[in-house]
A protein has these predicted regions:
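Conserved N-terminal helical subregion
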Residues: 2-3, 56-60, 68-147, 152-160
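Glycine-rich FAD cofactor-binding loop and adjacent beta-loop-alpha segment at the N-terminus
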Residues: 4-8, 12-74
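Hydrophobic "anchor" residues on beta-strands that sit immediately upstream
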Residues: 6-7, 30, 131-133, 264
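Active-site flanking residues adjacent to catalytic metal/cofactor-binding acidic residues
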Residues: 10, 33, 136, 267, ...
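Conserved FAD-binding catalytic core of PHBH/FMO-like flavoproteins
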Residues: 58, 133-243
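FAD/FMN-dependent oxidoreductases across multiple families
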Residues: 208-305
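C-terminal helical "tail/cap" subdomain of flavin- and related membrane-associated enzymes
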Residues: 293-370
Length: 370
């Protein structure tokens, strides 16, 4: 006879696996719908910036990668298009690192291994009835649509182009970002403290994206070198280029009941934000940390689908996600505006922020999840 599940998690990515491991500690019966990973001959370009809060969460389930696959960022440089510049350093904030750039395949492999050794987690090929279903399927979630949840999306006029680059010079554990007109370019240091490769994310105008994807590798790297002011010397592509449309989006409801089935959304199934500050996965991990904590501390007589508990989760997470999304959209629109007046205003603002002391310190610690 099939055992009844307390919680069925639909979605086998980082967010879904982490939630399963957190809930299993409370001896709940968990089903995880997670198809086996598909093998590919192409290198995986994905890397995420994870803050101290996310690091602590993953360490709590013993799934933090080693130093070669979770590169400490000890400094950040952000440059505007007219001399504005903001710098952060771990030393000035008295922390070991500002953030960590995590290799996604390495993290996913550790999470899969941890789940396999958990007796309270059952890997499923298809969803099963459960007291609560948590949807972690990403922004194209079919289950969210099945449950009749509106997902209001606003497209930015940009695509993100991601790739991995080898560099002539070591990255020195510095994350770098440039705002130049319609372009936002970020370099994320990889392969440990002495690494000479970076994860590149280039938010480029929609109209230019096809050209940049089809461009000869050498010509593409020359454009990246120019945009990055040659800071790491000669660059070479070491992965394919991948691209996706950028959008701001949030589900109209994060919890509910459909066809007698209680459900909650988490991660990109609930929200999307612009990647310019690298907060996407941090928000998703904060979702599952909040949900797991609420279920862990519930009164013994409350079921896991208690609507008061789920509403508490929705209120808490919607507030943070909305604030982050507004900040990211505001920054994107500020730097997208053309004209010398706007250019001077935003770069003056960057210089003021650089000299602001307490405000800059507070903003840095917020981004770090401290």
């Amino acid at each position: 006879m099939t055992q009844h599940l307390d919680i069925c998690i639909r979605g086998g990515g980082i967010v879904g696996h982490t939630l399963a491991l957190l809930l299993a500690r409370d001896r709940l019966r968990i089903g995880l719908v997670a198809p086996p990973p598909q093998s590919s001959s192409e290198p995986d370009v994905r890397a995420y910036a994870l803050n101290a809060k996310s690091k602590a969460l993953l360490e709590s389930v013993r799934c933090w990668p080693d130093a070669m696959h979770a590169t400490e960022v000890t400094a950040m440089q952000v440059k505007g298009d007219d001399g504005g510049e903001v710098n952060f350093s771990a030393a000035s904030l008295a922390v070991p690192a500002l953030t960590w750039i995590v290799d996604v395949p390495a993290l996913e492999a550790q999470l899969r291994d941890a789940v396999r050794f958990q007796s309270h987690i059952e890997l499923l090929d298809a969803p099963r009835p459960a007291t609560l279903t948590v949807v972690c399927e990403g922004r194209l979630s079919a289950t969210r649509e099945e449950f009749g949840v509106d997902f209001t999306a606003t497209r930015y006029p940009q695509h993100a182009i991601a790739a991995r680059l080898s560099c002539e010079k070591p990255h020195a554990q510095v994350a770098r970002q440039w705002f130049k007109g319609d372009d936002i370019l970020a370099f994320l240091p990889l392969d440990g403290p002495l690494g000479q490769s970076v994860g590149m994310v280039w938010s480029a105008p929609d109209a230019r994206t096809p050209e940049l994807l089809e461009m000869d590798a050498q010509d593409f790297c020359e454009q990246v070198e120019e945009l990055s002011e040659g800071c790491l010397g000669k660059l070479a592509l070491i992965s394919p280029r991948k691209a996706w449309a950028l959008q701001s989006a949030q589900a109209s409801r994060w919890i509910g009941v459909a066809n007698g089935q209680s459900w909650a959304l988490a991660g990109d199934a609930a929200h999307n934000v612009h990647p310019l500050a690298g907060q996407g996965l941090n928000l998703g991990l904060s979702d599952v940390a909040e949900l797991a904590d609420i279920l862990h501390t519930r009164a013994y007589w409350r079921p896991v689908n208690d609507v008061k508990l789920l509403r508490r989760y929705e209120r808490a997470r919607r507030a943070e996600v909305t604030a982050t999304d507004m900040a990211m959209t505001g920054l994107q629109q500020l730097f997208a505006r053309q004209g010398s007046g706007w250019q001077k205003l935003r770069n003056w603002g960057m210089q003021g922020f650089e000299l602001s002391g307490i405000t800059k310190h507070w903003a840095a610690r917020q981004a770090m999840g401290l």
